[in-house]
Amino acid sequence: GLLTNVLGFLKKAGKGVLSGLLPL
């Protein structure tokens, strides 16, 4: 559903932000 898509997008966005901030 739409909610699932939004949650998935937020998870991906969160990981992207963390990857950008942390020197991994």
Swiss-Prot record:
Q: In which tissues is it expressed?
A: Expressed by the skin glands.
Keywords, sorted A to Z: Antibiotic, Antimicrobial, Fungicide, Secreted
Which coarse location class applies to the principal site listed for this UniProt protein?
secreted
Q: Which residues cross the membrane?
A: none
**Top-level taxonomic group:** Eukaryota
One GO cellular component term of this record is: extracellular region
Location of this chain's protein in the cell? Secreted
Q: What is this protein called?
A: Caerulein precursor fragment B4
The organism encoding this protein is Xenopus borealis
Lineage here is: Eukaryota, Metazoa, Chordata, Craniata, Vertebrata
